[in-house]
Amino acid sequence: MSLKERFISYGYLIRLDKPIGTLLLLWPTLWALWLASSGVLDLSILLIFVAGTFLMRSAGCAINDYADRDFDRHVKRTQGRPVTSGKISAKEAVAVASFLALCAFLLIQPLNAFTKQLSVLALLVAFIYPFTKRFFAMPQTVLGIAFGFGIPMAYAAILDFIPLEAWFLFTGNIFWAIAYDTAYAMVDRDDDLRLGLRTSAITFGQYDVVVIAISYGMLFLSHLWVAQLANLSNYFLVGWFAALACAIYHLKLVSTRNRENCFKAFRHNNWLGGFLFLGIVLGLGVH
């Protein structure tokens, strides 16, 4: 394999071709950064968190491919992934994940000690998540914790403590992850059943769409509560209702239980997260 081909394989390993995961990790972090700073955010902190989000998502993808290498070869959608196809060794995947995680940790050195302590917990959860699909009936919950760690870290970096609103935001993000990743798990449900893996789509079975609806409901309720605690103006509702419309559209898609529609609903959650961010920006900036 030439050097160019190897770098291309590394790009696929960390999903440079699929930015949706980075965006789903970034939106909750941006929600928290704007709320914690009351809309007046230091540019250096913003850049640190944006870059850190990219690095940690990339590290998570690498460790995920390492963990799933023996399963991916049995699923048509994942057979071409670099590790399971043999383009990158398992040891290389671990090395890439470790290097990216180290870069992320070095990146946050200008931040306070509390943020650094939280980053260690975030790293542990991110690296544990891929293995939970073997024994935990709801790995999406762990994903929600991993994808939401930017929330307490953002508050810690700006305020040096974590207020009540942050925990409502964090809890809402866990429910959001359950919603969008259950839709994603519905795509591979037949393969996961055959391989003996655990996902929320398998755990809830025929009630999968109901669980997605309830999870979305909890997300939107949490944001309403956060809006009250943060004293956001009613302009927050512009983004909130736009996000709600997205969720209704997603429920229409997943109710078909068609693979393509479920995957479309998963990807479309980027818009939902973006609209909730818009609501926070408007709620803070327009009174």
UniProtKB/Swiss-Prot annotation:
Under Gene Ontology molecular function, one entry of this record is:
4-hydroxybenzoate polyprenyltransferase activity
Under which main EC class is this enzyme filed?
transferase
The domain of life for this entry's organism is: Bacteria
**EC number annotated for this UniProt entry:** 2.5.1.39
User: Pathway it belongs to?
Assistant: Cofactor biosynthesis; ubiquinone biosynthesis
GO terms classed as biological process:
ubiquinone biosynthetic process
Q: Which cofactor does it need?
A: Mg(2+)
- Record's NCBIfam families? ubiA_proteo
* Annotated family: Belongs to the UbiA prenyltransferase family.
What is the official name of this protein in its record? 4-hydroxybenzoate octaprenyltransferase
- Which species does the entry assign this protein to? Polynucleobacter necessarius subsp. necessarius (strain STIR1)
- Gene name of the record: ubiA
